[in-house]
């Protein structure tokens, strides 16, 4: 293939000063095989200058691959010194070694080592991603490299859609992406046919002519013959280092730099994070079924938490609405010390004068006397046992009792002890046949004839007996003409809107204590009941949510298990990313982002399912509905993110700790 590669390596300090680019002094590498120590390299001394074309040749097991791994900063020497461009590598940490690989070395592998789920363009871009190169510059450089190597029509092809020769050319482009000052080619033609192998060698020779330092690692003398210097390794030692008759290619003077790096650390970090999301998305959609199964536990957990929260809010609203329907902002005053006081009936101190005094309080909107007793009512030949209530005209406002028809009695009716009544829906049904007008009819209450002037609306309140029959008449009429009772059974007080009921209750107690001189009464604050209901509802919702959280935890464990499997399956991918310059933090971030993305997507689906359940719930349950709150949605997203981080950490940490050499060797 006749072509010219214009992307030349950047000049280095070693090149400018004539120093060796790579220097090994007394390098040995030992491995433990069980209890025995194995010496792979023995006292290696080697210098390679910039622009050289070197072949390292040796039989299988000779140590040439170990030497290449040390040269490429994939491995560390057990002893001795190795310098890259004058920088000692012995004391560098993993991230610093990754930076050396990223900025100085380009790897070409025998088996290409392309990521199968990425197309050619994205495979080539990977080193630049970890170098923090902006996206536009990265895309442009990758396209130009692939075009120069004859792959312009295969940018969107995945490795499985390319021939062996094409895959190796993609691998070469990837090696050049960050400049490729040193090209390390491990058996670059070993898996290719003769024509493709010749094509790849021509590319490597042209790269050498362009000024790149090219190191071939091979067992094939024919491949080694292309080099200007051949280093033979046997039993972990250099047994021969000779130059061939080939002339040393001179580096070109016009150096075109690699793609421009991100100017600021923050920009680079954001770019890496964005790319991590893109790569995570590609990895997830390439294993759709596994991703869906991984999400399943999260989906169930989030659906449970959000739905239970919505059901709890709906139930609380339903109960509070019913409490408000029987009189919100209301305080009732009764004789005795508390409900169930056996002496309460003997206490007859509540009086109409107390009602008058209460009505004068600033905090009180209205106060009404209440007396009541069971009574017999009759209309023609139909009679019924009802609860007779003597109240003031304000009672219906205090208790939020709406009228279906007619009016309530007035203050004038009360003064005149008018024989008028308001009946409830159940009494109307009991006394009057369907179609019979109740208003204006005269019924007997005990022995007192009374005219029906109003009918209340049907009451389906949770806190009111649905089958009870009630009749209301003016307090003065009930006390003077029916019951013969002057003291009150209770007083109902309505608080002005916007005022704290607890404070008003204290003032009411203070006034009543002053009037009576003793605590012969007690109060019942409906707002306190509402607060109790709210507190109980929150407690129940929390309890049920904690139960639902268990399914979230189970889902999180499922995510961790699948991610651990994913790390095992993608070990070689991790090795490839490390070889091209990924730091441990980059690998850790990659797998953490994948775990969080799985959980977030599962959370979104779970929230959607919850809304679907809410829609179906509304179709079949008419009395009340599920109430979704922004807080529950935010909580769901926070839970999803935390589950992803917590249960994705161990797989991400394991991935980041992998040895790049072992990872690359994994099938």
From Swiss-Prot:
A Pfam family reported for this protein in Swiss-Prot or TrEMBL: MacB_PCD
Membrane topology label: Multi-pass membrane protein
Domain ABC transporter: 22-260
Enzyme class: translocase
Transmembrane feature ranges: 292-312, 540-560, 601-621, 630-650
CC annotations in GO: plasma membrane
Compartments reported by the entry: Cell inner membrane
Annotated keywords: ATP-binding, Cell inner membrane, Cell membrane, Membrane, Nucleotide-binding, Translocase, Transmembrane, Transmembrane helix, Transport
GO molecular function, one term: ATP binding
Gene3D superfamilies: P-loop containing nucleotide triphosphate hydrolases
EC nos: 7.6.2.-
Principal location: membrane
Keyword DNA-binding assigned: no
Residues bound to ATP: 58-65
Protein family (similarity comment): Belongs to the ABC transporter superfamily. Macrolide exporter (TC 3.A.1.122) family.
Role noted for this protein: Probably part of a tripartite efflux system.
Complexes and interactors: Probably part of a tripartite efflux system, which is composed of an inner membrane transporter, a periplasmic membrane fusion protein, and an outer membrane component.
Protein name per Swiss-Prot or TrEMBL: Probable export ATP-binding/permease protein MacB
Taxonomic lineage from the root: Bacteria, Pseudomonadati, Pseudomonadota, Gammaproteobacteria, Pseudomonadales
Gene that encodes the chain: macB
